[in-house]
Amino acid sequence: AMVPLFSRMGHFPYQVPTAVVSKTLDFGKFRIQDMTDYMRDTIKVWDELGFDPDCICTGFVLSEEQVELIGDYIRSRKPRMDEIQNVDNGRLVMVDPIMADGGKLYNGIGMERVAAMRKLVSYSDVMVPNMTEAGFLTGICPGRERASASELRELVDGLHKLSGKSVVITSAQDSETD
């Protein structure tokens, strides 16, 4: 979903799948093909070709091993990205910690994935969790879809402690209004 947006902004997205999923996880029965080996091989090819991304975006991540692989990739490029980052060229790391919605973790995702996502969002310049993911990442209002304005501020502050940079919470609903 991010590719058209970043393409329109003038970036050339390189894509590498983390998993192939037979159906969304909410049906309870699904098949996931782990693509970690493919990711590792793809990154090696990118390095051999001298690819130098101006933007790194992550979405669904299957395992701690993938978090480590992505983290290593980001760290190997981040000093250069920080050196040239400015508003005009948009060099950044964006993390969408896809793991939960509707007040609960997706089927097949446990607290070990939440811990791995905390590590991954620490590399981000921009993180875009939904309300449920923000709650699980921070431990503030976990499992809730609505929060008061003060709880939402607390959630944003908690997310800032994880990355210290920009935070956008999607699908947040103020519990004090209808």
What annotation goes with each model-predicted range?
Residues A1, Q33-D41, F51, E65-L69, ...:
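Conserved active-site and cofactor/substrate-binding residues in soluble primary-metabolism enzymes
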Residues M2-V95, M99-N107:
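Conserved N-terminal subdomain of the carbohydrate kinase-like
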Residues N107-D178:
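Conserved phosphate/ATP/ADP-binding segment of small-molecule kinases
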